[in-house]
């Protein structure tokens, strides 16, 4: 193995932490808008964009000599992570998510009017439905990362996609406190 493939996760971790910190601090600028949920969502997009630029920049500049498909799999993992976050926001919120009006929580609230049994059934069904899309997204992310890695780097690309997925959510717990 080449040392660059060992150093790639370490370098991406560093880039991801820096991008997440910048994303968290961007909340100070974005929170002055009308919708705080949009500002929170945009901090994730800012962090992801900086993470992608830093990763591609490190490869293009020759700082780390790895196949470009590996960085593509990291971006794929990041996109899967962002989509999972949006799906979670859809199923747990009452505000529209990127223009799509949610019906999950209002449906549970409506079922509460008829009694505790229908409330429990509605909550259970929404909870079960909310896991379907993330599972499909993760499966597609695994398949896509394996395809990007080919026969040589397939498993490595799956691991790097998982790293991209997790680095996007580093700022999630901290951004809610700003």
Residues covered by each model-derived region:
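Hydrophobic packing and interface segments
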Residues: 1-171, 175
